[in-house]
Amino acid sequence: MRHRRYLTVLAAAAVVPIALSGCSGGSSGSSGDPDTLTILDYYNNEPDKTLVQEALDTCAADLGVTIDRESVPGKDLIQKVLQRSSSKTLPDVLMLDNPDVQEIAATGGLSPLSNYDVDTEGFADGIIEAATYEGELFGLAPAVNTLGLFYNVDLLEEAGIDPPETWAELKDAAAALTDGDQYGIAFSAIATYEGAWQFLPFMWTNGGDETDLDTPEVQEALQLWVDLVDDGSASNSVLNWSQADVKDQFAAGKAAMMVNGPWQIPALNETDISWDSVQVPVNEAAQTPVAPLGGEVWTVPETGDKDKQAKAAEFVECISSDDNQLALSESRYLVPTRTALAEEFVEKMPEMASFTEQVANARSRTGQLGEDWPEAATVIYNAIQLAITGKAPVDEAFSQASEG
Amino acid sequence: MTPATREPQQAANEETAPSIRAAAAMTRRGRSFTKDNVVKAMFIVPAAIYIILFFGYPVVKNLLMSVQEYTTKTFFTGEAPFVGIENYLTVVNSNLFWPSIVNTALFTIGSIAGQFVIGLALAVFFKRRFPLSGFLRAMLLLPWLLPLIVASATWRSILDKDSGILNQFLTGIGLDAVPWLTSPSVALTAVIIVNIWIGIPFNVTILYGGLQDIPDELYEAGSLDGATGWKAFWHITVPNLRPVVSVVLVLGVVYTLKVLDIILGLTNGGPANATQTLAIRSYQESFVNFEFGVGAAFSNILIVISLVFAVIYLRANRRAVDE
């Protein structure tokens, strides 16, 4: 008897997932209601979740639509998008991290904005480049971020050091600011795309290029990082620090300077550290700092429902309207993507001055290599790890890393 | 095969035994046993559906993916061109293949050895009853209860070179700080240490259960003949524990081969690829580089290695039954 009951339960349990998978299809994706837009993004943490919701609500009210929003953790977004594209349940409006746009556009899952009447004028070149695949623009970003050099004002004043502008000054300042368990500088050289992203401002500023990594310009940038660690001005824990860890080190007073982005500002303002930021230092005084462009792009997936796609395109245009750009930039410490807004923005938010300047010259990671960028990024972070650990000399690190 | 899937089959076998007898009785009366066959089949159906759905399909799909060019495009277009063994060639020819095999072997052997020795020592220790022994034994399960992602984040801060508590302790007693997670020569050791910590509860629990099954009379009889302490352990405990030991070791190997989250959380395969294992390669190819075909090839190699150990386990088990 006992066995029989056990089996009945088992049989029931075996049927449940089948039944469940049968009904899950209809609940997500482009919904049937013509006035409801489904939205998928990765702002699942506060305060971003609420701040973005405000922008979305504004646009929903403007267009007279209701929205059905889903936010997933950042690292799950691409998997979610792939799953949904295979089950043909892509949302009406999709947010993507800008280096992923071309990869997803290449699958054929996105609808080019030229199909709709969308105003794409006045945006910074970098972000248009990031969202363009084979000559077609696939999305717009209301606000972007980049990298800069944060410094601890008190520590630099105490040591009588001005914020560094060149690599030589950076090395000297970092060495002078290293004392006991306080390091001069912190950055992220972790074995993920984050490590590659942090390296780009140094590599690009020095004239290096991801299409050919085996050049003296790229090697000089790597040498700078290796020197900082070898001199003891940076901990060799940089090999395992994410950018959030770098911010924690800086906030704890264990690093006098750090390479990081403006999205850390809310967290820094909660500490009693007095900080300021400058553009990433250059190798030679005549160079212009070139940093990578970060931030998310809103796109219109191919859902098959033409009317809704048109509405979604209007929605994407609205998210990137001037008012929304300024509102989102102010609340989330980003930089508006319409270059004409820069002056007005810096007046309101003087602490964002260096980042706004940095964004004007910033490049997108996928501008040159498109969907092949992840491969180059992997080579970059592997080369950094090989060189800093001493497993390969700087001049061989990139060729060794590119062998896989 | 895991215990969870074996049970229903066994249950089904035991259940069909009486109905076979009933069927035999019916044959004597007439040839109306089709209904009985249906009933028999019904008992197998749930287990069969379960196995086909949750074991058969993924395995077949994975084999298929490994001979296809399966990328992000495939998800939208559904097209995955057949490429034969190209993915396997990519895997074997990649510079990280042999290092990741070696790392997988070192990681597995190191983890199992550490987990088993410490687990057995603790199990023997807790066999004696002493105040709070029940409470302490329950506390030992803690690493098992923590989500792995929490455990690895905590260990990451413990092992931090500059401010980690372990290095604070080491420098406090006059030793040098160790760059646990940032030096390619010690990172694998650090990851193994953490995995040992996570695996101890499993080993203690199963081995403790095995120890409980050894009758006390054996020890009493042994002590009359002068077998106490180490002698009792070698000549009474070890031989009687052998079947349990084989279960612990084989399951341990299979669980350890596929460890992913701990390594991802601690080092993400770094520094300088020092902690790349087959499981990490498979994950990174599939979910970082979106080369699902190559990732599937890596995981198939991993499955074959696991399978070898599963076969060893099944054979060892059969021998035990034969004896």
State where each predicted segment sits:
Chain A
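Conserved N-terminal structural module of periplasmic/extracytoplasmic solute-binding proteins
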Residues: R2-V16, L20-E103, E284-A286, D307, ...
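Extracytoplasmic "Venus flytrap"/periplasmic binding protein-like
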Residues: A55-D125, T132, E157-E165, A256-M257, ...
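Extracytoplasmic/periplasmic substrate-recognition and gating elements
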Residues: D57-T58, A159, D230-A234, N269-S331, ...
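A structural signal for short loop-to-beta-strand junctions that line the ligand-binding cleft
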Residues: Q83-R84, P91-D92, T120-D154, Q287-V290, ...
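Hinge/lid segment of periplasmic solute-binding proteins
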Residues: N98-T146, K171, D179-D181, G195-Q198, ...
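Periplasmic solute-binding protein
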Residues: I104-G109, I127-P163, S188-E210, L293-P301, ...
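C-terminal capping/gating helix-and-loop segments adjacent to ligand/active sites or protein-protein/ligand interfaces
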Residues: T132, L334-V335, S354-E403
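Glycine-centered hinge/linker elements that transmit conformational signals in sensory
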Residues: A174-T178, T211-L239
